[in-house]
From Swiss-Prot:
Specifically methylates the N4 position of cytidine in position 1402 (C1402) of 16S rRNA. SUPFAM superfamilies: Putative methyltransferase TM0872, insert domain (SSF81799), S-adenosyl-L-methionine-dependent methyltransferases (SSF53335). The lineage of its organism: Bacteria, Pseudomonadati, Pseudomonadota, Betaproteobacteria, Burkholderiales. Pfam families: Methyltransf_5 (PF01795). InterPro entries: RsmH, SAM-dep_MeTrfase_MraW_recog, SAM-dependent_MTases_sf. One of its GO terms (cellular component) is cytoplasm. It catalyses: cytidine(1402) in 16S rRNA + S-adenosyl-L-methionine = N(4)-methylcytidine(1402) in 16S rRNA + S-adenosyl-L-homocysteine + H(+). S-adenosyl-L-methionine binds at G35, G36, H37, D55, F79, D100, Q107. Its EC number is 2.1.1.199. This is Ribosomal RNA small subunit methyltransferase H. It comes from the Bacteria. It is found in: Cytoplasm. The gene is rsmH. PANTHER family: 12S RRNA N4-METHYLCYTIDINE METHYLTRANSFERASE, S-ADENOSYL-METHYLTRANSFERASE MRAW. Belongs to the methyltransferase superfamily. RsmH family.
């Protein structure tokens, strides 16, 4: 069975129902993946509707090119390029933006992509293997301080400093052992350092997450695309974001809350509340996968979906 067939889209019906409020509108799928959300969006759009999808992964682009629908187009780039990419296509406003964050099952399950500590493979971790610096290349040059900061901040790993020192010590042995360039060896190094075990988690989980986030600039791109989505959404348009770990969800939560609240004003100033600008967003809901979905797809367990609506022009 192919990777595409093994991928299960999380919160499929809930996300699409929240996103498509105007069937003749322009929707954006910021993370095409293997097309689960995009195909469901197309099924809900009217003939005058339009869907523009983004993805960095060349394999996702290949899958997207198999969709023969005049309403659909795919952009081979990060969703961080959304504002410019839509402007180049003459799109000024959209009725919905969907972001399904993180890695897809086919990416994790393919050892050649270097995302997983469960199977040995090249230490790559790039969403787009044709662009940028691989995990192995970064590990070959990063200082103890940089390694510590990335593993601590992006992996929330309390043994970050010890892991960083072990990685630099391994690098010093490169002349004798060769470069650190496989996921198996990275997982082994981390496992030797992290002696405690979180229930249901491999000791390398946090470090792999941190390196992947750094290599792909995931959190920086998320900040950029949230700002872009806010400016692109028409009045009544929806922003729907599915995240899978606390770092992403925290950014999304704070963004939505900040733009759904009236600006703070010193109460000593003679400004009436009615004279303040209205916040551009209204928070609609926060949703989680059902027990049935988690039972069928355990990877959905950590998912949280946040929905906000643009309420000002």
């Amino acid at each position: 069975m192919g990777n595409e067939l093994r991928h299960r889209t999380v919160l499929l019906d809930e996300a699409v129902e929240s996103l498509v409020t105007r069937p003749d509108g322009v929707c954006v799928d910021g993370t095409f993946g293997r097309g689960g959300h995009s195909r469901a969006v197309l099924a809900r759009l009217a003939s005058a509707g339009r869907l523009i999808a983004f993805d960095k992964d060349p394999r996702a682009i290949e899958t997207a090119q198999g969709i023969e629908d005049a309403r659909f187009s795919i952009v081979h780039d990060s969703f961080a390029s959304m504002r410019d990419a839509l402007a180049a296509r003459g799109v000024e406003k959209v009725s919905g933006v969907l972001l399904d964050l993180g890695v897809s099952s086919p990416q994790v399950d393919d050892p050649a992509r270097g995302f997983s500590f469960r199977a040995d493979g090249p230490l790559d971790m790039r969403m787009d293997p044709t662009r940028g610096e691989s995990a192995a290349e970064w590990l070959a040059r990063a200082s103890v301080q940089e390694l510590t900061e990335v593993i601590r901040d992006y992996g929330e790993e309390r043994f970050a400093f010890q892991i960083a020192k072990a990685l630099v010590a391994r690098r010093a042995e490169s002349d004798r052992l060769g470069p650190l360039d496989t996921t198996g060896e990275l997982a082994q190094i981390v496992g030797h350092v992290v002696k405690t075990r979180e229930k249901g988690k491999d000791p390398a989980t946090r470090t792999f997450q941190a390196i992947r986030i750094h290599v792909n600039q995931e959190l920086a791109d998320l900040q950029v695309v949230l700002d872009a989505a806010l400016s692109l959404l028409e009045q009544g348009g929806r922003l729907v974001v599915i995240s899978f770990h606390s770092l992403e969800d925290r950014i999304v939560k704070r963004f939505m809350q900040a733009h759904a609240s009236a600006p703070a004003v010193d109460r000593r100033l003679p400004i009436r509340a009615v004279d303040l600008p209205s916040p551009p967003l209204k928070i609609i809901s926060r949703q989680f996968p059902s027990e049935a979905e988690v039972a069928a797809n355990p990877r959905a367990r950590s998912a949280v979906m946040r929905i906000a609506e643009r309420v000002t022009p």
